[in-house]
Amino acid sequence: LKTSQYIHIMKLLNITVAIVLLTIISCNRQTEKNNPYKLKILSTSEEYLNSLNENNDNEFVDLIDWVPGVVLDIRYATSNNFTGQVVYDSPRAFARKPVARALSDIQQELKTKGLGLKVFDAYRPYSATLRFYEVMQGDTNFVAAPWRGSRHNRGCAVDVTLINPENGEELEMPTPFDDFTEKAAIDYMDLPEEAVKNRQLLIEIMTRYGFTTIPNEWWHFDYKNCQDFDLMDVTFEMLDEIRK
């Protein structure tokens, strides 16, 4: 090769190498931003589909399809939440298949009592957990520690209350959803008698079908064997595309 051609080829190679290196650095920085604690998180369609091949119970289903008559009030798809920001792109409620089955059974029993479920939140992408932690400036009393991830990120936790299906009104509870005060604790008793009774009814029926409580949020319930499910950072839109 002529010297000029050689120089030109070397310049092109150097440019190509530089582009590749910059791409790798950019990808690494994005990964660090999305998963700063280096957790095992499934965040692509391929990873999610592979998990379905391992166990069909890993499937995310839409609670609207699986729980007849359930009412959704997905606060994080609005600004009516503790962040004051819209966090979700759409007001959807997804959960793992066993969780949806249990909620369907609960809804059927509640129907015999003239009651029903309202869902405030279900599966939550890990990116939202990072955002909540940032908003709360590191306070993990009411938001999940991002170095562990939330059970919502695993698709096996739900935030719910009871309603009267006839008029859609919520039953009286100790506090509104996402009230970060001592009154939200499941053992707080300085409350109206009706609120205590309704809270106990909710806890009793949820625990009977495999859910457990957490101390400081009367509305939050984790399904049994929750740790068996992977942390997820798959968007609602991605789940919809996969389900088509």
What spans do the regions from the language model cover?
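Bacterial Sec-dependent N-terminal signal peptides
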Residues: 1-37
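Short active-site loop/helix that positions an aromatic residue
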Residues: 132
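Extracytoplasmic cell-surface/polysaccharide-interacting catalytic and binding patches
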Residues: 28-120, 135-216, 225-244
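Segments that shape or occlude catalytic/ligand-binding pockets
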Residues: 125
